[in-house]
Amino acid sequence: MKLKNLIILLSCAVLIASCKGKGLFGKDKKHDKSDVTGWNYNDKNMGGYQVSKEKEQATGPGLVFVPGGTFTMGQTDEDVMGDFNNIPRRQTVPSFYIDKTEVANVHYREYLYWLARVFDPANDPSYQKIQDAALPDTLVWRSELAYNEPLVEYYLRHPSFNNYPVVGVSWKQAYDFCLWRSDRVNEGNLIDKGLAAKQGLQAQQGEDNFTTKSYLLGFYAPQPGKQGKKSTLKTAQGTPRTQVTMEDGILQPDYRLPTEAEWEYAALGYISQNPRPSQKEGKRGEELIMNKQIYPWSHNPNGMRDTRHGSWQGMMLANFKRGNGDYAGVAGGLNDDAIYTSDVKSFYPNGFGLYNMAGNVSEWVADVYRPLTLLDADDVAPYRGNKYQKMLIVDSTSADPTTRFARDSMGRVKYTDVTDKESMMRRNYQRGNVINFIDGDSLSQSNYGYGNTTLVSDKSRVYKGGSWADYAYWLSPGTRRYMEEDQSSATVGFRCAMSRMGSTEGNKRKTGNWWKDKRQKR
């Protein structure tokens, strides 16, 4: 009996020792080590430097992964408009994510509902301006010689149009939607991990709401949720914590509008023209594109109809205007079966699984418009529109982020423009605002602001792809048009994108080429 009790006591002692970070028989728990110092990671006895397990970027809601690569950007069809604004040029686009579909009415109304709940004018009349600024312009449906009042009244709100693309949204409104979506997705990630409670959502009012940056800086502290028993978040002292940092891999990068190069690359979907694309680690694909495409779809990429045998043979592959007065065809045999817009998941997806990259509605992209951007821009990740900013410091003597920085009326951390004086000694850029770099500034041959004799300005934004009201010519991804960033149209919507962090070919894949290590012979 005494021997039995002794065995039980010894077992308890071993368990207690293991709970204190020791292994069996009191040996130190194994830790990952630094390759440069040899010190343990995640060891409170060696400084407590925390390094999370290597995590791959999760695919955000609604997104599709697009592996990067090289392609010829620009005109793929005859330039019948004579714009000479999309000269073909070889470009490389880094991997990224993009929405499978255009943002629909139901998605945008979710955004409007959140604004109405958090920025309730009953609490502060000034909040009405925030709601008004986000409302789409439904009057874009009006035309002097057409009866479109039903669309003005019902298109945004009626449930029959829930999954139809939102229109009447300016570039600025689309940009703000991306900011809001980023914060809601990251807030949802915290709730899913038990690091924030759902109960705290209803208490958010005014500037006291979750934004990713304000959370990281400590301006906003959510009500903690119920974490699992195996929480991996620890402080330097080894105790559990609920405050997440970017290094933990839980928060995702921002949603944003795709660049023009990203959008065009994604629209072409050339992976479907690769005869043997790489499917898994260690299996190298062909570096080959069999056919150059005019349109996004892989079936009959130079025509408008499906050529495959079956009930779908002859069906239109996009929602567009076939000719004067022909938006849908003849009753009983409609060709694209959509007079105006259609469901965001209608028509055949392209090689990346993306819907309506041609037709339905044109889409805003991030770039500022210039006719010759393709000649001026970098040949990797090209983009015109950089205006560098930094967080606004209101108290430079404070080490506390909540007093060193400030928030605006919507709870977002305030930013200020980087000045030319701050940039002049840098090697990679010398100005804070480089929107008109080499095309409209004093160093270039073109000056788009001089004398106000042009419609092109630093507020002109590119939109891509054809719409329900366009002829087939505009459905080619290489075509490009522009509007001012505060304007909108019944034919222009948008979709969001997100930058890819880590491996170029996606999760469970390594970056670069790898060879097996060989043992040296003695």
Question: Where in this protein do the model-derived segments appear?
Answer:
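Short, P/G- and charge-enriched loop/turn segments at secondary-structure junctions
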Residues: V51-K53, D83-N86, R480-E485
